[in-house]
Amino acid sequence: MGLSNKFKSFFFLDEEEEYYEEEVAREPEPMQKKTKKEKPNKNRFYAVEEDDAKVVSMQGAQFSSRMVLAEPRVYAEAQELADYLKEYKSVVVNLQRISHDQATRIVDFLSGTVYALGGDIQRVGNNIFLCTPDNVEVDGSISEMLDEQNFM
C-alpha cells in the first residue's frame, strides 16, 4: 500500500494538500477620458478626431492629378503601366501598334491591376483604354460610337 499511496500523492493532491485561493473583489476604477492621437495612415485621405470635433485632412487635394499616355510595343511594358496606377496616376493606353494577342494580354493584366487597386478600366476608342485608380472618377460615356464600330 505504501507504493500506491506514493503514486497517488505524486500524481494527485491529497485532500489535505488542496489549497483554495479566495479572490479579493476589487472596486472598478473610474475610467479616464482618453484623447485619440493622430496615427499615420497609408491612405491619402483620413479623418482625425480631436475632442469630439471631427476634422478631415485635405492632404490629397494638394497633389496634382497626373495622366500618363502610353503606347506599349511589347507585353513586358504592362508592368510599368501598373506601376503608374499604383502611384495614383491615370493611364491612357493606345494598343493600335501591337498585335491582337499581345493587346489582349495587356488589357487582361491591366484589368486585374485596376481591380486589385479598386480602380476602373474603360474603352475610349479603337484599341484605346483609360485606366484609372480609385481616387479618379470618370463622368460621361462614349459607348454609342463604340457600338457602331468593330473592336477587339
From Swiss-Prot:
Single biological process term from Gene Ontology: division septum assembly
Main location: cytoplasm
Key words, A-Z: Cell cycle, Cell division, Cytoplasm, Septation
Pfam families: SepF
Signal peptide: none
Keyword hit for Cell cycle: yes
Location in or out of the cell: Cytoplasm
UniProt superkingdom: Bacteria
InterPro entries: Cell_div_SepF, Cell_div_SepF/SepF-rel, SepF-like_sf
One CC-aspect GO term: cytoplasm
Protein role: Cell division protein that is part of the divisome complex and is recruited early to the Z-ring. Probably stimulates Z-ring formation, perhaps through the cross-linking of FtsZ protofilaments. Its function overlaps with FtsA.
Entry similarity comment: Belongs to the SepF family.
Known partners and oligomeric status: Homodimer. Interacts with FtsZ.
Protein name (record): Cell division protein SepF
Lineage of the species this protein comes from: Bacteria, Bacillati, Bacillota, Bacilli, Bacillales
Gene name of the encoded protein: sepF
